[in-house]
């Protein structure tokens, strides 16, 4: 047997032994360090490399798959929130505000005119999502199928999928390309080949793999009523809006191409349409300074003109080929020292209210491409350690959600209570209802309810209407058709949250109707609760419900 053949035989033997030891440990109710086990068995058998997790998962007998897969799952955080997130990229295209300002933002890498010419705007082409998109030649169907297969091989459930459409300003692309892109995302889940977005959505609604939502990255100038209407037809439920700074002078100096006033107007319109609003913010921009950075985040969370539902923190990076790189090279811009940046991020995280989710704390750009800026690949961990040292707590949604708590702290909720928080934001009355264990500060499920303002442009939301902008029960993914007593999805928390939302809408808001901005794949769930399709929303009349 040649060397290659003998290595293959050793690999098969090693995988069999590892699986056998895993089954023994499971039967004896023992925990196993998989990395250590792989190392020991591979070394014992004279294998020159460790077997891949995908191969070990493939070697697990079918009668042990259900019990062993959760223990073998790679990066369990990927589906800890109850959803498999699939990030896809649109084709490279120029940023639309070049036509008005003559150039892109000073810090922005990537795009067709950059040193990274195969990348989309604001990406380098070396981020994991970018590389998957380039391999698939930016084909949305291939990107989706490839990522789903990858997640399944790593032991994750892909029963509930949320898409994030990245790669510049998607809504600035031609309508026929946008329709093609969205159609293929839905078709990749349903297996059907559709001729229109409407047909794709109809098949996706009944698909085994449910599209529970689509998130689209955009800019305030591409969040006008016509854009909001188009995104509703796509099945979009969440917007990621690039804000970067709450200061008008910084927006002007960095060449953003829009004002902060337009950001506030966008938030108002988006929330009155039912969308969840996540914003991108960049600490350490030129001409800001540490104190102004702290003040803008205080304003972001406390001013009713902002108050986003989610936040992506992207500390400024200096990357070759950008205007900022030239400023840095000539000494006109200097990044915060690493310790100062960690302190700033820790301060920002301590300010986050309990109804806001911090999705990211840094960009996915590989460190070798960064000339100056973030020096830690795990900035969130450093910031959390600093908070612990200072006696501060991060109370954002992600830190408290039950799936993350189980993975990181091995704690489960005991005394669960219904908790309500009210606040005003963007011209409307917001109510954040949640099921939590207040003693351990663990979040199990949440609902965002809004009393629509009189500025709503959608006909379905005019008059006395309340809208549910988000309903989410956390914990690792459970199939829509299954119930698992150890997991929190499908335990009735969702319907209890909806009952409370209906009561508040009827008795306190004085609303005649309650609407839900629902992902395409979750419409059937709302039908069971007495809701009907009302344009792109699921709605219920409250007067008849009360009777």
Swiss-Prot record:
Biological process, per Gene Ontology: embryonic morphogenesis; olfactory learning; oocyte development; regulation of transcription by RNA polymerase II; spermatogenesis; translation; tRNA wobble base 5-methoxycarbonylmethyl-2-thiouridinylation; tRNA wobble uridine modification
Gene Ontology cellular component terms for the protein in this record: cytoplasm; elongator holoenzyme complex; nucleus
UniProt cofactor note: Binds 1 [4Fe-4S] cluster. The cluster is coordinated with 3 cysteines and an exchangeable S-adenosyl-L-methionine.
Molecular function in Gene Ontology: 4 iron, 4 sulfur cluster binding; metal ion binding; phosphorylase kinase regulator activity; tRNA binding; tRNA uridine(34) acetyltransferase activity
Domain Radical SAM core: 78-368
Function per UniProt: Catalytic tRNA acetyltransferase subunit of the elongator complex which is required for multiple tRNA modifications, including mcm5U (5-methoxycarbonylmethyl uridine), mcm5s2U (5-methoxycarbonylmethyl-2-thiouridine), and ncm5U (5-carbamoylmethyl uridine). In the elongator complex, acts as a tRNA uridine(34) acetyltransferase by mediating formation of carboxymethyluridine in the wobble base at position 34 in tRNAs.
Binding site for [4Fe-4S] cluster: 95, 105, 108
Cofactor(s) recorded in Swiss-Prot or TrEMBL: [4Fe-4S] cluster
Biological pathway: tRNA modification; 5-methoxycarbonylmethyl-2-thiouridine-tRNA biosynthesis
UniProt keyword annotations, A-Z: 4Fe-4S, Acyltransferase, Iron, Iron-sulfur, Metal-binding, RNA-binding, S-adenosyl-L-methionine, Transferase, tRNA processing, tRNA-binding
Assembly and interaction partners: Component of the elongator complex.
Keyword field contains Iron: yes
PROSITE patterns given in the database record: GNAT (PS51186), RADICAL_SAM (PS51918)
Species of provenance: Caenorhabditis elegans
Domain (N-acetyltransferase) ranges: 392-547
Protein name as it appears in the record: Elongator complex protein 3
InterPro entries, sorted: Acyl_CoA_acyltransferase, ELP3, ELP3-like, ELP3-like_N, Elp3/MiaA/NifB-like_rSAM, GNAT_dom, Radical_SAM_C, rSAM
Superkingdom field: Eukaryota
Phylogenetic placement of the source organism: Eukaryota, Metazoa, Ecdysozoa, Nematoda, Chromadorea
Record family assignment: Belongs to the ELP3 family.
SMART domains per UniProt: Elp3
CDD domains cross-referenced by the UniProt entry: Radical_SAM
Binding site for acetyl-CoA: 160, 470-473, 493-495, 526
NCBIfam families on file: ELP3
Catalytic activity, reaction form: uridine(34) in tRNA + acetyl-CoA + S-adenosyl-L-methionine + H2O = 5-(carboxymethyl)uridine(34) in tRNA + 5'-deoxyadenosine + L-methionine + CoA + 2 H(+)
EC number: 2.3.1.311
